[in-house]
């Protein structure tokens, strides 16, 4: 079983810290995988973390870490991350399931799970 932290949270939500690179790194260091929200800036190829909008500029190297699951929040971020074989990403809005770039089924809360979920 893989334990996946949501935006770095491991003991309930902390909206002031979630998606901050230091908060994410702390969860990774504790042995969790982490789902992060990633936004893309058009034309520059740069990426940022944040739930409702880009908040923290981030480099590709950070996102290449084992255990990070990148939730692309827009087509720009998904396109740019999908070109990097070392970044694990997926995109969905209200879909029951999304296929990640590493072949996992990302299933929304309360949806049926499979051996690939």
Protein language model regions, located:
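Phosphate-group recognition and catalysis centered on beta-loop-alpha active-site segments
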Residues: 1-117
């Amino acid at each position: 079983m893989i334990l996946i932290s949501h935006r770095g949270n491991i003991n309930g939500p902390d909206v002031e810290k979630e998606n901050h690179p230091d908060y994410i790194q702390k969860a990774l260091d504790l042995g969790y995988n982490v789902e992060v929200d990633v936004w893309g800036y058009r034309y520059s190829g740069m990426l940022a973390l944040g739930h409702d909008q880009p908040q923290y500029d981030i480099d590709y190297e950070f996102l290449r870490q084992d255990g990070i699951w990148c939730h692309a929040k827009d087509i720009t971020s998904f396109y740019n991350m999908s070109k990097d074989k070392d970044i694990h990403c997926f995109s969905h809005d209200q879909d029951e399931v999304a296929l990640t770039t590493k072949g996992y089924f990302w299933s929304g809360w309360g949806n049926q799970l499979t051996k690939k979920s």
